[in-house]
């Protein structure tokens, strides 16, 4: 689908209304530092003659400026997608970027009015905390996710899955497991929901084929889905900065040393470097109380594509 210039101009004007500086906090998310940005600009603290340069303050203000515009960009791309496509769907794995998108969709009102549907694939091998967390954010934001799982198995019925496909399928044939538990339910979910625009959390920092993605991709000629990549220009640090700024509900495994998560069978936390603490689930690097504790560089590097998963 192609949009005329007037549509984009209208969307751009509307996006300003949703700028973080104009955001009214609700119980769904509390902006802790939006006051740092006023009237669309931030005054940087430059050192006067004889005064010491406050580097930490400068960095904090610079990060706030960056995050402000990243938010505006992300909300603009979501608004264009949800307002111009009747069936925008967000496949949500509840990783850090996904909870940010969930919060942005809430701020725009698209979870409440149904202009964006949330889709979740339950592989039956997720961490127990993952589906529990889904129930929490459904209650928190007031939406109901569309959950899909292996074909021919009732949602949430692990015993039925084991009986039909075998509890050890992933050990015996990992390619078949991926097809049965991930690929087929994902594709079926998009088709069932009549998806014409897929919202996702892909970002350039993940590299490889994602290194040059833009915030929006038109549907391929001949068929396919349009894609909205609201976090295309975000780093993982930006993502956690946003979670901290608005106190966004996030996966409990972050507090146990997991920068990212997938199936429990093949996701590990950051290993502890303390010989007195051999348990990797008690590593000293984690996200807790709205901040990264431990080696921040290690945390963000370990969460990169194909690491720790």
Task: Please report, for each region that a protein language model flagged, where it lies by residue.
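Nucleotide-activated chemistry modules centered on ATP-dependent adenylation/adenylyltransferase
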Residues: 48-309
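Proteolytic processing junctions in secreted/extracellular precursors
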Residues: 17, 38, 43-48
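Intrinsically disordered, low-complexity segments used for protein-protein interactions
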Residues: 20, 25-26, 44-46, 271, ...
């Amino acid at each position: 689908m192609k949009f005329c210039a007037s549509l984009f101009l209208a969307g751009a004007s509307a996006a300003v209304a949703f700028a973080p500086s104009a955001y009214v906090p609700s119980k769904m998310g509390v902006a802790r530092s939006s006051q740092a940005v006023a009237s669309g600009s931030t005054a940087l603290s430059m050192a006067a003659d004889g005064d010491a340069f406050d580097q930490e303050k400068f960095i904090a203000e610079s990060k706030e400026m960056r995050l402000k515009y990243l938010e505006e960009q992300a909300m603009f791309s979501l608004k264009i997608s949800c307002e111009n496509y009747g069936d925008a769907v967000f496949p949500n794995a509840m990783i850090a970027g996904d909870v940010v998108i969930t919060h942005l969709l809430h701020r725009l009102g698209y979870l409440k009015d149904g202009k964006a549907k949330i889709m979740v694939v339950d592989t039956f091998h997720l961490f127990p905390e993952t589906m529990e967390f889904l129930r929490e954010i459904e209650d928190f934001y007031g939406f109901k996710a569309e959950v899909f799982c292996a074909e021919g198995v009732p949602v949430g019925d692990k015993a039925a899955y084991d009986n039909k496909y075998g509890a050890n399928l992933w050990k015996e044939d990992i390619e078949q497991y991926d097809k049965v538990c991930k690929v087929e339910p994902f594709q079926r979910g998009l088709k069932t929901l009549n998806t014409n625009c897929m919202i996702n959390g892909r970002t350039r920092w993940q590299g490889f084929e994602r290194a040059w993605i833009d915030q929006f991709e038109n549907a391929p000629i001949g068929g396919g889905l349009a894609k909205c990549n609201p976090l295309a220009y975000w780093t993982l640090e930006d993502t956690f900065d946003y979670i901290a700024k608005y106190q966004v509900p996030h996966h409990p495994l972050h507090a146990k040393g997991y920068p990212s998560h997938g199936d429990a069978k093949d996701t590990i936390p950051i290993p502890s470097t303390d010989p007195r603490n051999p348990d990797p689930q008690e590593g000293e690097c984690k996200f807790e109380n709205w901040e990264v504790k431990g080696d921040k560089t290690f945390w963000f590097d370990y969460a990169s594509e194909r690491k720790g998963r």
